[in-house]
């Protein structure tokens, strides 16, 4: 029993767990943001993990988790752009086509709710390749190569987000 007005460890028992549930929820939203590219998924997962490290005062284990999360975030972010770009350009699509596809996806995001990113991105890539190649079949094959490359990037980002979530989970269990 404790005196009125004092705080006992027992009275705060739910606060860290509630904070960790909030971090977990943000991380799950981040993973979903990788699959449905409306939110910056990988960044959300990383920011939630770093917030967990920082807001609770750090400590050696948490700092190691924070460093691991940051390394995974940087490596995953670089890989999700570099590897698909190499794959697409290796299939014959120039970087200008990739940039036009990104611009089309961005425009589609604002112009067509829900599916605009896909419609705008694919449409822009196909039109760019049609202008460049002057043949619908060749443009479609090139568009598929770019779509496969984008899929590779999404898989890399998803794998990184899941690894980050797993790293954080181990950190929670250890601390």
Question: Over which residues does each language-model region extend?
Answer:
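Helix-adjacent hinge/juxtasegments
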Residues: 64-108
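Short amphipathic alpha-helical coupling elements at transmembrane boundaries
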Residues: 52, 86-93, 138-149
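Hydrophobic alpha-helical transmembrane segments
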Residues: 20-24, 46, 66-71, 98-102, ...
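Transmembrane alpha-helix interface/packing and boundary motifs in multi-pass membrane proteins
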Residues: 28-44, 104-114
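Juxtamembrane interface at the ends
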Residues: 84-90, 121-137
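Alpha-helical transmembrane segments of multi-pass membrane proteins
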Residues: 26, 30, 52, 72-81, ...
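Interfacial segments of multi-pass membrane proteins
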Residues: 44-61, 104-109, 123-132
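Juxtamembrane boundary at the C-terminal end of a transmembrane helix
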Residues: 164-175
């Amino acid at each position: 029993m404790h005196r009125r007005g004092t705080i006992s460890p027992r009275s705060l028992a739910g606060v860290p767990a509630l904070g960790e549930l909030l971090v977990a929820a943000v991380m799950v939203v981040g993973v979903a943001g990788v699959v449905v590219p409306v939110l910056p998924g990988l960044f959300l997962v990383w920011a939630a993990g770093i917030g967990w490290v920082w807001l609770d005062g750090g400590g050696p284990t948490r700092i190691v988790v924070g460093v691991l999360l940051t390394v995974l975030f940087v490596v995953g972010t670089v890989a999700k752009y570099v590897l698909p770009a190499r794959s697409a350009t290796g299939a014959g699509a120039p970087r200008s086509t990739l940039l036009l596809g990104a611009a089309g996806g961005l425009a589609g995001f604002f112009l067509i709710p829900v599916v605009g990113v896909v419609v705008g991105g694919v449409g822009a890539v196909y039109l760019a390749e049609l202008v460049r190649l002057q043949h619908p079949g060749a443009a479609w094959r090139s568009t598929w190569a770019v779509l496969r490359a984008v899929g590779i990037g999404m898989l890399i980002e998803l794998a990184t987000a899941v690894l980050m979530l797993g790293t954080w989970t181990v950190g929670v269990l250890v601390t």
